[in-house]
Structure formats: structure tokens, C-alpha cells
A protein has these predicted regions:
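Residue-level recognition of membrane-helix boundary sites in multi-pass small-molecule transporters
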Residues: 21, 53-54, 84, 113, ...
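C-terminal transmembrane bundle of multi-pass solute transporters/carriers
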Residues: 67-68, 79, 85, 89, ...
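Small-residue hotspots at the loop-to-helix junctions and early N-terminal turns
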Residues: 39, 49-59, 150, 260-267, ...
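Juxtamembrane intracellular "pre-TM" segments in multi-pass secondary transporters
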Residues: 2-19, 199-232, 415-418
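Short amphipathic helix-loop junctions that connect adjacent transmembrane helices
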Residues: 39-52, 246-260
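Substrate-agnostic recognition of the 12-TM MFS/MFS-like secondary transporter fold
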Residues: 20-40, 59-77, 81-96, 113-172, ...
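Helix-loop junctions on the cytosolic side of multi-pass membrane transporters
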Residues: 134, 138, 176, 180-209, ...
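Transmembrane alpha-helix termini and helix-breaking/packing motifs in multi-pass membrane transporters
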Residues: 43-47, 101-106, 162-182, 254-255, ...
Length: 418
């Protein structure tokens, strides 16, 4: 059946057996991940009497390892067996989620437990992300890389569609514990899926010999103004604009005075938009159009502002899918551009630096957003995040307006000689 998939179609990456295995397992993992995110936020609000500052701190602690370890994860991605490394990172993530679930169900959990386990999960996630990103090209080959990235994003956001609603109903019926246990199980499933991959069906990449250092990766980026433009845009758009998780929790509880089920529905609403954005991206190849990314971020910033001024819960929920669509088209375009236009020999390190840019500001931004929401309210905080995103996109467009193309030769040697 899969051999008949159109080689030019939206689902062409599913022709690869290894990709099908990972894709199926990732669906369960993505549902579990989003279920845990909702449950963890709700647990923090329960333990701290709806204090947004604590919510920001927990988010920051989970992303702090990204700031400290994502670049090292990128170095590992260029040196180690990626499949074996991903088995280890998912085992660690599963144990972390299992521990939080058991502590919660036995009713001994406190905010310190959440802090510690958020850091542990963050450590494994920080190492996993650049290795997994660099591994995709080995699973499907470079011709199908962009399509595989888009389908993975669609998978992730389908999980975002199901996970929050599932978690909302589980919280209402049984409390937050079951969501953590589901996530633990999902990590163990994808761990075994990596073990089931056939090594002889992986696509070996021709890799030139390089230093293998972060210094070399930074020198490469210094010569690539197209990559600089994307990193500048994404740093501000992701670390300030992409805070719907915190925004939704605070708007649901403090502005619209809703319960767990309604909060979970907001996560589903934004997932409708992000899933649509991922499927649209699977049809379009923008890997040769770097200027599209700051333009997309500009559009995204406008829809973040629309969230800030939404007068009712219903209107807020209706704006979320559009916000999600604009966010996803921005982020997936940036991610696929970085992978498709980085040399094989340095891709892991470039993606490690990109992950740092993408999420590394969260440990700083999340507490600030949580604190600001306590001082000036969620609406003004969201408006401020929108303003920062808009300004960053405009600055990137102005500074790099003449850098809208990919170099003819992206090899490490050629770029460093230029």
C-alpha cells in the first residue's frame, strides 16, 4: 500500500518504512506530551493558588537545560550514533514523567517536586531535540526532508489537538496524575520504535571532515547572513510570541474565569490552526526563500495582538486557530530552511544552536511574562509580547533585506572561505 504513495505527494515520506514506524509512535508521544503540558500547568496553578509567577518559573526550569545543553546536543549529533542516543533520551524522559505521575496520584507532590522533574525532563529534551532533528535526513533522505519535517509538525500538532482536550477531561474526572502516566507510557513506546528501525534502510550522508567544534559552527553562521536573519527573527518570535501555553492558562483562569475543561479546549483550538499550518507547509517548499520567514513572523505578531484584545472567551477561542496557523507556518519554514540549507557535516551543531535560539530565551522570558501578568494583567502582557515580535520581524527585514537567497555552495569549506 505504501509503495503506491505518490513520490511528489503530501505523504511521500511515508514510503520509508523507518519513517512510518517513528511517525506512528510519535503520534502517541505527541498526545502524551501535550497532555502533560496542560496537566503540569494546572497542577502548578492548584499548588500555588493560581499564581502566574510560579507557572512562569516552572516553564523556565523546564527550558533552562535548553539554554545550557542544546548546543552540546548538537555537537553530539555530529559525533555519536543518533539512533542509540535517542533511545537513551526517551528512556530518561519516560522515567521523569512516570515519577511525576506517581507523586501526583499518591498525593505527595509539591511544587519542589515539579521544579526538579521539570528540570530533568528539560535535560533529556535539550539533548534529544538537535539529535532528532539531524536524524530525520538519515531516515528519509534529503529529497524528502522538507516533506518529512512538515509531516512531523502535522503529527506534533495533531497531538496538540487531542492532548489538551484529553488532559482537560482527565483532570476534571481524575485529577492531573493520569496525564503524566500516559506521557510516560508514550515515551517508552517511541524508545522501542527507535530500537525497531532497520539500520540498512537508513540513508547515509556524505560528510566532509571538519573540526566538529561549536567554534566552527559559529564561524559558519557568521558567514551565512540568511541564517543570521532567521535566528534573529525566531529568537524573539518564539520566546515572546509563542507563549500561548502561559497565555491560555492565565486568560482562562484570571480573565475569563473558566475551569479545566475550558482551558483544555483552548489548547485544542490553537492546535486546529497549527495542524492546518503544518499540512499546508507539506505542500509548499520555501527552503529557498529566507525572506518569507520574517514576513511570516510579522503576520504572526499581528494575530498575537488580536489575542490581547479579544473581549470574550468565545472570540479568544476563535482567534486561536488563526494565531496557531500563522505561528506554525513561521516556525516550520524556519526549521526546514535551517536543515535543508546546512551542510551535512555541521547540521547537528547548527540545529543545536538553532534550538538554543528557538527555546533558550524561555528561562528568561517565561518568568518575566508570568511576573508581568501578575503586575499588569494578562492582556497587557500579551500585547507586549506581540509588540516585541513585530519589532523584531521589521528589524530583520530591514537589516537583511538584500540577503534573500541561499549560497550556491553551502559546504563548510566553501562557506568559511567566502
Amino acid at each position: 500500500m505504501f509503495s503506491k504513495i505518490n513520490e511528489e505527494g503530501n505523504w511521500r515520506s511515508l514510503r520509508h518504512r523507518n519513517f512510518r514506524i517513528l511517525y506512528a509512535a510519535a503520534l502517541l508521544t505527541n498526545i502524551g506530551t501535550w497532555a502533560q503540558r496542560i496537566a503540569q500547568d494546572w497542577l502548578v496553578l492548584e499548588l500555588t493558588h493560581n499564581n502566574g509567577t510560579y507557572l512562569g518559573i516552572v516553564t523556565a526550569l523546564q527550558f533552562l537545560p535548553v539554554m545550557l545543553l542544546s548546543m552540546q546536543g548538537g555537537v553530539l549529533a555530529d559525533k555519536v550514533n543518533k539512533k542509540k542516543a535517542l533511545v537513551i533520551t526517551n528512556l530518561g524522559s519516560g522515567i521523569s514523567a512516570l515519577a511525576l505521575g506517581l507523586l501526583t496520584i499518591t498525593k505527595v507532590v509539591n511544587i519542589d517536586h515539579v521544579y526538579i522533574l521539570a528540570i530533568l525532563l528539560g535535560i533529556f529534551s535539550a539533548l534529544d531535540a538537535p539529535i532528532r532533528s539531524a536524524f530525520i535526513v538519515e531516515v528519509v533522505g534529503k529529497p524528502d526532508l522538507t516533506n518529512a519535517m512538515s509531516l512531523n509538525s502535522a503529527n506534533f500538532h495533531f497531538g496538540r489537538l487531542i492532548g489538551p482536550t484529553l488532559s482537560g477531561f482527565l483532570i476534571a474526572a481524575f485529577g492531573t496524575g493520569p496525564s503524566f502516566l500516559i506521557n510516560a507510557f508514550s515515551f517508552f513506546v517511541i524508545m522501542f520504535s527507535f530500537m525497531a528501525l532497520r539500520d540498512d534502510e537508513l540513508h547515509e550522508q556524505k560528510i566532509e571532515k571538519t573540526e566538529g567544534t561549536l567554534k566552527e559552527a559559529f564561524a559558519y553562521i557568521k558567514k551565512r547572513r540568511d541564517i543570521q536573519m532567521i535566528m534573529l527573527t525566531i529568537f524573539f518570535a518564539s520566546n515572546f510570541g509563542l507563549n500561548a501555553q502561559i497565555f491560555n492558562a492565565l486568560m482562562a483562569t484570571k480573565v475569563f474565569h473558566k475551569g479545566a475543561a475550558s482551558y483544555g479546549f483552548l489548547g485544542t483550538a490553537i492546535a486546529v490552526g497549527t495542524l492546518t499550518g503544518a499540512l499546508v507547509s507539506a505542500r509548499k517548499d520555501r527552503t529557498k526563500r529566507p525572506l518569507f520567514i520574517p514576513l511570516a513572523a510579522l503576520n504572526f505578531g499581528i494575530w498575537v495582538m488580536a489575542l490581547a484584545i479579544a473581549p470574550t472567551y468565545l472570540i479568544y477561542a476563535l482567534v486561536l486557530p488563526i494565531n496557531g496557523f500563522s505561528a506554525l507556518t513561521t516556525m516550520i519554514s524556519a526549521n526546514t530552511y535551517m536543515q535543508a540549507n546546512s551542510d551535512n557535516a555541521i547540521r547537528g551543531r547548527i540545529m543545536g544552536i538553532y534550538m538554543f535560539i528557538f527555546m533558550g530565551g524561555t528561562p528568561i522570558g517565561s518568568p518575566l511574562i508570568g511576573y508581568a501578568s501578575q503586575q499588569i494583567g494578562p492582556r497587557w502582557t500579551i500585547a507586549g509580547c506581540s509588540f516585541i515580535t513585530l519589532i523584531a520581524a521589521l528589524v530583520a527585514l530591514f537589516i537583511y533585506r538584500n540577503d534573500g537567497k541561499v549560497p550556491e555552495d553551502i559546504s563548510v569549506a566553501a562557506v568559511l572561505r567566502s
